[in-house]
């Protein structure tokens, strides 16, 4: 998929580029039965307090209902369309099953309109098919991986992401994740064959602040530009140093390289090699 790079007709255009959606998107309006609207929370919780900073505004979006479970076994589905989804970096594929039901799935790289996909133990090893890990050959590239059988895919779902099935030992399969982490997952968990599409997403340059605002992302202010009451880095005369042994979050916790994973987590025993 190509990238359109704009000529510098204005300061905002100078560094901007966009994906050439016409090359892959085949349908502009979502399937009505598979969307719903949701109130914007702007990073607030049910008490109205900000729990996620730098959120708010942005273009109105409809939420697409995506099938991460891939539990409709043994029924072939035809790819009707490849669609854009404003809520994620990957594209969606609209499937029409032989019994007439329609579902969205993450569109893998190479999946085209007219292709047939299937899920279940009897599915072939081809792009877009979903199977339990025990039926997938070692060395296969996979995405949309479950951590618990039946819960639905939780790992490797963003644009261009791919994991590899490295080995099978007893009840567990060893998977190498995009982060470099090696971890065991139950062989009963499902995964989808192939790599998530939209590989060029990482090469797009936003170009201007306003484009981030369209996405619902607000400015991030440096702590050193604040007052001491607002941030541990704040205050001082001119461009003062941090004044601490290392950088801190707004709440005084160490940051930038500080490990935040909970100690002695029960799932630690499944991680063979920590992420990079």
From Swiss-Prot:
- Basic and acidic residues composition bias: which ranges? 265-276
Cysteine disulfide links:
none
Q: Which SUPFAM superfamilies match?
A: Nucleic acid-binding proteins, Translation proteins SH3-like domain
Provide the Gene Ontology terms for cellular component. Answer: large ribosomal subunit
Question: Which parts of this chain are annotated as the region Disordered?
Answer: 223-276
Q: Which PROSITE patterns match?
A: RIBOSOMAL_L2
Could you give a GO molecular-function term held by this entry? structural constituent of ribosome
* Record-stated family: Belongs to the universal ribosomal protein uL2 family.
Query: Self-association or partners: how does it assemble?
Result: Part of the 50S ribosomal subunit. Forms a bridge to the 30S subunit in the 70S ribosome.
Descriptive protein name? Large ribosomal subunit protein uL2
Taxonomic source organism: Caldicellulosiruptor saccharolyticus (strain ATCC 43494 / DSM 8903 / Tp8T 6331)
